[in-house]
A protein has these predicted regions:
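Beta-strand-enriched cores of mature, soluble protein domains
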Residues: 1-151
Length: 151
């Protein structure tokens, strides 16, 4: 049976100034603080809790590897842990515009990830039993993500 995608939620997160870590065996590492934000979807909505971060690195082939970890607080006060690992890459000229904080159409670059959730027992524990993918758009001070459940 062929799987389909079902919209889970749309998330907007405000980002802090990247903290350069430097060269590592993986590539050029930086930490991007996640300051907060909001999310909404057909089955859940709430806020992005400040305090998370994206421990990303840029490989030699100029692919950015995203390794984000953060919390979501639902409208009914349940905390959901998110781990999101993905890739962002595109033509050099497009990446330079993104780095400069310019507005770039997300269709000009590839930004995909595979989020996973850790939810407590209760109304959202179904998140622990599904696989998800997401697509994203990077902006100067924020990120916009669309999460999909693989059916």
């Amino acid at each position: 049976m062929r799987p389909d995608l079902e919209l889970l939620l749309e998330l907007r997160a405000n980002l802090g100034t990247p903290i350069p870590v430097g060269a590592t065996p993986d590539g050029l590492r930086r930490v991007v603080p996640i300051l907060g934000g909001s999310f909404e979807g057909p089955r859940l909505r709430g806020e992005v809790v400040g305090g998370g971060a994206d421990w990303q690195y840029v490989r030699q082939d100029q692919v950015t590897v995203v390794e984000a970890q953060y919390l979501l607080r639902t409208h009914d006060d349940v905390l959901l842990q998110v781990q999101n690992r993905g890739l962002r890459h595109g033509p050099q000229e497009v990446l330079e515009r993104l780095s400069a904080g310019e507005k770039v159409d997300p269709g000009e670059y590839y930004f995909r990830a595979a989020p996973s959730f850790s939810a407590p027992a209760g109304p959202y524990d179904w998140l622990n039993r599904s696989l998800f993918v997401c697509s994203g758009a990077r902006h100067a001070l924020s990120v916009h993500l669309w999460f999909y459940r693989i059916t």
